[in-house]
Amino acid sequence: MLEIRPNCEHCGKDLPNSSTEAMICSFECTYCKDCALDLLENVCPSCGGNFQPRPIRPKVMLAKYPASEKQVHLPKNKGKIEKMKVRYRLIKPEKR
């Protein structure tokens, strides 16, 4: 089950459960749409995977399965970002 992390790992922007700006990779690294698509160019700096919009957990399920409140703010090193982008940005996600 997804944690539904509450913020962008790079810039720290709030991304509550209801946010349509949240993007995740297959390991649930969480970024805002601006960081994921503009800064990172759809390449996760941790795994090299792509990003997809994070699903919104229905309100009726939040009491039983609450979204995480743990802030994860780990701004990525520019060198690491560039290294991953150069390696993967021209390769379609299904071919990485």
Each language-model region and where it sits:
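Intrinsically disordered, low-complexity regulatory regions in eukaryotic proteins
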Residues: 2-96
